């Protein structure tokens, strides 16, 4: 997997939220996913991720996901590890910037899905002034 393919995966994540397409979004997430680094040492699995995104999309809470500062860390035949800043923008315009390490794995011989995220740092960003609805 090249950096271009990682960028395509990140774009697909963003587009799935912009289209409010939960099925397309979850197709990018492995059923064995684990998210670490949350408050209280909680770990989020596939069901937790699905429940949260379903709630955010049904209630119109999450307006967009965007990514920047991509740094490739390791590439193997079936796995790639990278660091990225993810900006989650709410429908209210509030945003959270999350720095995280991400591991994608090729599943089913062709589909790249996230299998692990390690949240390193997050901060509340400035209120977005553009129309995000």
Language model regions located:
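Short, low-complexity N-terminal intrinsically disordered segments enriched in polar/charged residues
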Residues: 1-32, 43, 47, 126, ...
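Hydrophobic alpha-helical core bundles mediating ligand binding, dimerization, or RNAP-core interactions
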Residues: 10-13, 17, 29, 33, ...
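A mature extracytoplasmic/lumenal domain signature
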Residues: 29, 39, 71, 86-88, ...
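A short gly/proline-enriched turn/hairpin at secondary-structure junctions
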Residues: 34-44, 58-60
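Surface-exposed, charged secondary-structure patches
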Residues: 50-97
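Short beta-strand edge/turn micro-motifs at domain boundaries
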Residues: 95-133
